[in-house]
Every structure is written in structure tokens, then in C-alpha cells.
């Protein structure tokens, strides 16, 4: 469903394919209202992982929307921490799978993939299959652990639903119209992975962080390691492989694409350098897919900035 790709040679075919995927369950219609209210602009936020200070070179308009495959980070954490799948267990992706009557597609058949490669290549078949026994309550519990229902500084949370007795895969793939995290929450998600759960209070330069509690989340070293490896591999060979040519900044990231009316919105969130994380970032684009817009625009911001 939300299987991202950064290939550009088949952009027209990819767009048609995405439309066919995202048409399931009326998701296109469900996102029409947001499309009409969307600005079509690109937003970019970054944060210092030592001080918690947030920079916003595109302005402080905090968009929220369907997160797409970024939610696979949350799902991977739940799957690994709850032992719903073992770290090295593989699932054979043949390009599609049917879950409770819904056909879920990947852009390509990924073959046998484990958790790390499923994150890197955004394999929807892997996550939909591995999450068949995951309840919405469990997924939301982990989404809450990542702060997707809580404010970031003075900015309120985006839309967060109550669990129902239904399948979790629309949330796992970031395609439910009832879950709309905002850009700062997705920024914090990457900061959490980068710092293995210990993140300073995120704030603007005008806001004091004195006395503010740090964000803390405890997972096993195994889980943190798989999440970090997956995001690193996404930039080296996966859905964000055009983000950091030559591995100059040592970026780790996760892409996400979702419907916005009859078009697409996309996200890219990550951190760098992955061997000693100092910065996290999030880019949101309301006018295209991750391969067409989010990755190239994030690359521009990352390489145009003089990082201390």
C-alpha cells in the first residue's frame, strides 16, 4: 500500500500504480478535504539532538497529514518488542498480499526480507503480513510511546484516534484517515530513534527548555539496532538512496507517501550522522511523492545548510 520507491525513470507508471493502491478503502475520497485545505508547500524542520532547539527555515507552519510508510518504524518497534516476529525472520514478498479481503501491494516484489530490509525498502507486504495478529490497541500503544498523541513544545498533537476492534494494517502502513501526526511529531520520532529513546525537550530559540522534562522511551538494544539499521540502509540502497550521495553526511531516514485527494503528499524524516547522531530533521511535501519531491527537496536543505 505505502511502498515507497525513489526511482525516477518510471514516475508516470509509479503514479498510476500508487493511485491504484491508495484507492483501496476509499482513502482517496477520505483525503479530499485535506487536499482542499492543503497549501501545496514544502516544510522543513530540524532539531539539535543535544540542546533540543528546533530550526524552521521554511517558517513555523506545522502541517499534519497521513504519514504513509513512516509508520512502519512504529510497527517495526511493536513487532520486535512484542516478539510478534523474530529479528532475522524473513517474509517472502511476491509484490502483493491479501489481508482480510484487501489486496496490499508493493511497487516491486522484494523477495525474502527481514525487518531491517523491510524498513529500508518500505515493504508493505512484510509489514501487513507480520502485523496480521497485531491489534489496533497494541499499535496505538506504541504510537503513544513514540509521542504521536502528545504535544511537541507548545504545538499540540495532530489527529490521534481511539482503537477499534478491527485490523491494524491501515495504521501500520500510515494510510488511515484517522491518524494525522504533525511534522514536529515525525521530527521527534526520528530523534527518538537516533538517541535510542533519550531526547531533550524540543523547543524554538524563543522558548526556554529550563525545567522541561526530557522524552524517554526504553526498548531493547536489539530493537533500537534494527530500527537504526533499517533507516541507514534506506539511504544507502533503499527508498531514500538519492538523499545522501557518497554518504557524505551519513544520513539515516524513512520515507512516506500517502494520498492527498487525487494527488500525493510525502514525508522524509531522519537524522545524521548515524554513527554519532547530532541532528534530526523532517520534511513534508503536500505536492508529490517521496521520490519526486520529499527526497530531492530534503537533499537540497541538508546540503545547503552549514551544520555546526
Q: Which functions belong to the PLM regions below?
A:
Residues 90-96, 107-170, 176-177, 181-184:
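Active-site-adjacent helix/loop patches that line small-molecule binding or acyl-intermediate pockets
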Residues 267-269, 277-288:
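Short, well-ordered beta-strand elements
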Residues 241-275:
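Short, Gly/Ser/Thr-enriched beta-strand-loop segments that form substrate-interacting elements
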Residues 44, 52, 63-88, 118, ...:
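Active-site SXXK
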Residues 3-25:
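N-terminal secretory signal peptides and thylakoid transit peptides that target proteins
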Residues 35-59, 281:
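A short, well-structured edge-of-sheet supersecondary motif
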Residues 55-70, 112, 152-213:
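Active-site-proximal helix/loop microenvironment
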Residues 89-119, 187-245, 307:
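Conserved active-site-proximal loop/helix segments of enzymes involved in bacterial cell-wall
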Amino acid at each position: 500500500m505505502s511502498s515507497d520507491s525513489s526511482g525516477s525513470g518510471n514516475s508516470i507508471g509509479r503514479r498510476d500504480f500508487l493511485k491504484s493502491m491508495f484507492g483501496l478503502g476509499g482513502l482517496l475520497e477520505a483525503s479530499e478535504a485535506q487536499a482542499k485545505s492543503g497549501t501545496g508547500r514544502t516544510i522543513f524542520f530540524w532539531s539539535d539532538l543535544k540542546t533540543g532547539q528546533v530550526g524552521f527555515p521554511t517558517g513555523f507552519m506545522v502541517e499534519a497529514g497521513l504519514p504513509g510508510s513512516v509508520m512502519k518504524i512504529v510497527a517495526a518497534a511493536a513487532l520486535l518488542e512484542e516478539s510478534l516476529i523474530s529479528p532475522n525472520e524473513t517474509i517472502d514478498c511476491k509484490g502483493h498480499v491479501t489481508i482480510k479481503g484487501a489486496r496490499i501491494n508493493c511497487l516491486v516484489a522484494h523477495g525474502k526480507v527481514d525487518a531491517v530490509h523491510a524498513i529500508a525498502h518500505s515493504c508493505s507486504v512484510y509489514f501487513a503480513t507480520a502485523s496480521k495478529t497485531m491489534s489496533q490497541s497494541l499499535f496505538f500503544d506504541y504510537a503513544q510511546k513514540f509521542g504521536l498523541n502528545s504535544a511537541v513544545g507548545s504545538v499540540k498533537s495532530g489527529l490521534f484516534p481511539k482503537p477499534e476492534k478491527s485490523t491494524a494494517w491501515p495504521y501500520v502502513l500510515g494510510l488511515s484517515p484517522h491518524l494525522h501526526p504533525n511534522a514536529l511529531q515525525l521530527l521527534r520520532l526520528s530523534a527518538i530513534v537516533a538517541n535510542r529513546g533519550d531526547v531533550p525537550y524540543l523547543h524554538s530559540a524563543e522558548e526556554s527548555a529550563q525545567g522541561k522534562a526530557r522524552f524517554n522511551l526504553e526498548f531493547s538494544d536489539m530493537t533500537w539496532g534494527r530500527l537504526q539499521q533499517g533507516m541507514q540502509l534506506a539511504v544507502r540502497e533503499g527508498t531514500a538512496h538519492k538523499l545522501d550521495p557518497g554518504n557524505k553526511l551519513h544520513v539515516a531516514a524513512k520515507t512516506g507517501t500517502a494520498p492527498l485527494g487525487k494527488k500525493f503528499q510525502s514525508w522524509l524524516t531522519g537524522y545524521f550522522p548515524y554513527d554519532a547522531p547530532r541532528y534530526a530533521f523532517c520534511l513534508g511535501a503536500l505536492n508529490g511523492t517521496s521520490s519526486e519531491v520529499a527526497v530531492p527537496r530534503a537533499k537540497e536543505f541538508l546540503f545547503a545548510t552549514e551544520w555546526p
